[in-house]
């Protein structure tokens, strides 16, 4: 016998969270909980403002329609990426497809203070990997900060994310301030330039490896082995169903590319599922999930070891 609940929620964010020039004061989303007999499965639907095509309200309408269809016996999935992902996660839990084992390591997000990063990395098992957002300030400053971190911590590898912020000139200004001897320890730089061609040229000219992120969601993108391209960053909330995520991971691995499962600032419930997806589909690759510290609370399922308060399901607003 099938049954379902849908919950709507809103989590206050820390004051300094800015996405594409917009301050994110709250993270808004939905949960779906599906039941079939004794089995239960949860999924999170939280479109990311400025990145997702769909709004929270559109996702809510699509989710409620899909849940009602599912209760009538339908087996399809919604079209909207965030709704497709959340619904497919709930189904994967319900049917036991999504393994329980999780990779709760997360590449720490670094603000540029090497002393702070040294402390955070000290507790990190395995290879020392951190992530730095670049492109928010002057390219020269970014280059100096990255160089300082790599110089201060000799076994550190950095993942950098520019979100297509730079012109070719700005990208070159950044590279100029990174010692060529340290560049091999830049694991990859996500989307340095506004166009893929400019990003490819940057990789060839500087020897700094790049990764595709936004490009994966563009209609003309195809997976291919290219000089200077080392990785793809997959954000399931922006990608779509679990099957689509699996297809992208498989396509990347077939070309020898690293596939990194990455957060779209989901709640703790969604992040714990992404940690399970990472352990399942990209074992051995550190996922990019260090975003819970941007929030003021956890919900339903806490992240292991995190001290933030965790709201229970009966504290959420129920829609269905």
From Swiss-Prot:
Its cofactor is a divalent metal cation. GO terms for molecular function: magnesium ion binding; O-succinylbenzoate synthase activity. The active site is at 133 (proton donor), 235 (proton acceptor). CDD domains: OSBS. Its EC number is 4.2.1.113. The keyword Magnesium applies. Keywords: Lyase, Magnesium, Menaquinone biosynthesis, Metal-binding. Pfam families: MenC_N (PF21508), MR_MLE_C (PF13378). InterPro entries: Enolase-like_C_sf (IPR036849), Enolase-like_N (IPR029017), Enolase_C-like (IPR029065), Mandelate_racemase_C (IPR013342), OSB_synthase_MenC1 (IPR010196), OSBS_N (IPR041338). Disulfide bonds: none annotated. Mg(2+) binds at residues 161, 190, 213. It catalyses: (1R,6R)-6-hydroxy-2-succinyl-cyclohexa-2,4-diene-1-carboxylate = 2-succinylbenzoate + H2O. GO terms for biological process: menaquinone biosynthetic process. Belongs to the mandelate racemase/muconate lactonizing enzyme family. MenC type 1 subfamily. NCBIfam families: menC_gam_Gplu, PRK05105.1. This is o-succinylbenzoate synthase. The gene is menC.
């Amino acid at each position: 016998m099938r049954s379902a609940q849908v919950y709507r929620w809103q989590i206050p964010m820390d004051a300094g969270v800015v996405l594409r020039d917009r301050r994110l004061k709250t993270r808004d989303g939905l949960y779906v909980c599906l039941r079939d007999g004794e089995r239960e499965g949860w999924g999170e639907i939280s479109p990311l403002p400025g990145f997702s095509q769909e709004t929270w309200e559109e996702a809510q309408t699509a989710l409620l329609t899909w849940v009602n269809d599912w209760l009538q016996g339908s087996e399809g999935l919604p079209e909207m990426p965030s709704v497709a992902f959340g619904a497919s996660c709930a189904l994967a839990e319900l049917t036991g497809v999504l393994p329980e084992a999780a990779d709760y390591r997360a590449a720490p997000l670094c603000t540029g203070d090497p002393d702070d990063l040294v402390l955070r990395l000290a507790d990190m098992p395995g290879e020392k990997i951190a992530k730095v957002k670049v492109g928010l300030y002057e390219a020269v400053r970014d280059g100096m900060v990255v160089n300082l971190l790599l110089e201060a911590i000799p076994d550190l590898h950095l993942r950098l994310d520019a979100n297509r912020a730079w012109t070719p000139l700005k990208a070159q200004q950044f590279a100029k301030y990174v010692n060529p001897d340290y560049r091999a320890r830049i694991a990859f730089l996500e989307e340095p330039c506004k166009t893929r061609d400019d990003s490819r040229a940057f990789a060839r000219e500087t020897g700094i490896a790049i990764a595709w992120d936004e490009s994966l969601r563009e209609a003309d993108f195809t997976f291919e082995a290219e000089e200077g391209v080392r990785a793809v960053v997959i954000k399931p909330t922006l990608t779509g169903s679990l099957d689509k995520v699996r297809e992208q991971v498989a396509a990347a691995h077939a070309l020898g590319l690293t596939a990194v499962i990455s957060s779209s600032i989901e709640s703790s419930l969604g992040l714990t599922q992404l940690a399970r997806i990472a352990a399942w589909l990209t074992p051995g690759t550190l996922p990019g999930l260090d975003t819970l510290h941007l929030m003021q609370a956890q919900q339903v399922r806490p992240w292991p070891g995190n001290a933030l308060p965790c709201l229970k399901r009966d504290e959420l607003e129920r829609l269905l």
